[in-house]
């Protein structure tokens, strides 16, 4: 499963080899790299030959480990690489990026991190909470800088002392979800809700805080809460079917990577039962959920790259570099599911407008590349 790509972004930057919003998965390499056949990717981003600093450019090795192959996380990786390429060109430095995806396998994750350390990576990048926690443990003695991306609650899982002052060698970007805002949309769409399902993976630390917030909100309204969980695509599919049998009127899922990976499998189960699935990221809506509410992952990826550059080029101390959070007021609605549920998108957009910074539409697809 190993995939080794060698991508030199030099003068090719002007040709826009990568797009800022596209989603890049392990199997979707640029045209000149399609012959590569492994799971890991080595990407070198360098200044153009004409750059004044190119003759003495400094090179940095960065190891990026992605937790799982899904639309949100792939979009983050894509935009980290794209932004690093731009910074490398601008500053006249070379970023040699080693990328791999552990596919939610903790043993493989540990091996990937060990490989990065064996290659003397100058900085490690953890995409999603489980990878960040593994990198924290792996760098406890070395102090190698770690920048995490899309960690929903870095304080509660012990990655940082506080968002303002992380306190160690880790900092990064958070995709913290305003759960109450999602609940508000749910009840604006259907004020008569009496039974709501919560679908998530008990083992996902990223989901824990949001699930507790959702339960408190719903119970405060006197709504019956049905919880169903799973740790794999098959288990999530069974849990979705169980929620339909339970007679829930709506389902909520936070930024849960296991459910995200399962969405293409389960979305028809909910749509055919007339149940809207409210979720914590636009990628869920891309893969068939009724609504995704949360951060712009393309922007999160770019900002993660800015933090990487600040540490490597400007000497910023991760311990004193605040975790970056984002406005997550964008509601992404799947218009195909909207129609299937008998909901008028234009009317719903007007209804949601006072509760969101932005309402946008999307159609069902596997990746963002397919809808751009």
What residue spans do the PLM features occupy?
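Bacterial lipoprotein signal-peptidase II cleavage site
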Residues: 18-43
